[in-house]
Amino acid sequence: MGGLAATAALPAFAEGTDCASSASAPVCRREELQSELIAKWNDGTEAVSPQVYGQYLRDGDTRGFWALDALERAFEKVMREAKETTVAGDVPAVWSVYNMGYIVKTRESLFSIDLVHRRDAEFASLLDFALITHNHGDHWRHGFYGAMDGAHKTVVSNFKDNYGVKNRKQDGGYVRGVKTFRIKDVEIRTSLIDHNDYLIDFTAAFEIKTGDFIIYHTGDSGRGTEPKLGTAWGRPDLWLFFPGCGVNTAKAVEKVNAKRIVFGHLWELGHPQGHRGRLDKRDLRPRLAAAKTAGCENVSVAFWGDRII
């Protein structure tokens, strides 16, 4: 099915907000509008198979697919707004780029978490450092890592050596686990959680503190890892959460007790529709409901390009 023909009824990328996201203000949406957009984005991404997405990554041709055009515009929007935005207090500016990828700006720093995009290396010159939760291709790309490493910028992960943030054991393995450090005005605490039943302690969760504001990013979290979730520095102001890979949403929400939750990993195009690594409409709606039932009233999704705070 052709890209444009399949998505002709969808709204323009800039539409669909009650208050437009910009360099000076985050997006906000009524719950009813969010529900409508979930359905429309689900239809718009359905036409893009993993094979088509792979071709786009290789040659940059969107082939008229609405979702791929949206992905290009999202990147340009976030880069433009990140350059234009000034942060004065402890509360950072946070943008959703794609999947579990976010850009965060504080008073002194600009950094990424799990940034993945065809053009992600273009951000390297702007960033002070980057965080990567785990060694899967939908959470990091070699070109981006190479650009950061080549520019002598810190990349924090649990699988790459970079400027002393992570040390090697004498036997050649990696020191993995809880580590706390500071980069400019950002304090970071790492811990390990399970990606799924067999990738135990595979994901590095990041507790990120700027002043008194706490962001918690848990990458991919799987079934049974709920007891490992949680922050040491206080209740998270914002939890960037993927309720897939088998994690029990209600148990996780009760354990973390975040003030606000934003779901990520939406419509990850490298996975086929229906795969648990791709949060589609079928699974998204009940998990939004489960998070609210578990006690978090402020739970939402971030579409590509949204400024969250």
Predicted regions and their residues:
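Divalent metal-coordination and catalytic microenvironments
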Residues: V104, H134, I188, D220, ...
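Active-site environment of divalent metal-dependent phosphoester hydrolases
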Residues: R119-D120, H136-W140, D161-G164, K179-F181, ...
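Portal/gating segments that form or line small-molecule/metal binding sites
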Residues: Y145, D149-K160, K166-I193, A204-E207, ...
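Hydrophobic/aromatic beta-strand patches that form the interior of the parallel beta-sheet core
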Residues: L131, V156, R189, L240, ...
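Active-site-proximal loop/helix segments of hydrolase catalytic cores
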Residues: V116-R119, D194-N257
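Binuclear metal-ion centers of metallo-dependent hydrolases, dominated by the metallo-beta-lactamase
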Residues: K169-E187, I200, G230, E254-I309
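Metallo-beta-lactamase
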Residues: T7-V97, I103-F123, L127-F129, W140-F159, ...
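N-terminal export leaders
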Residues: M1-A6
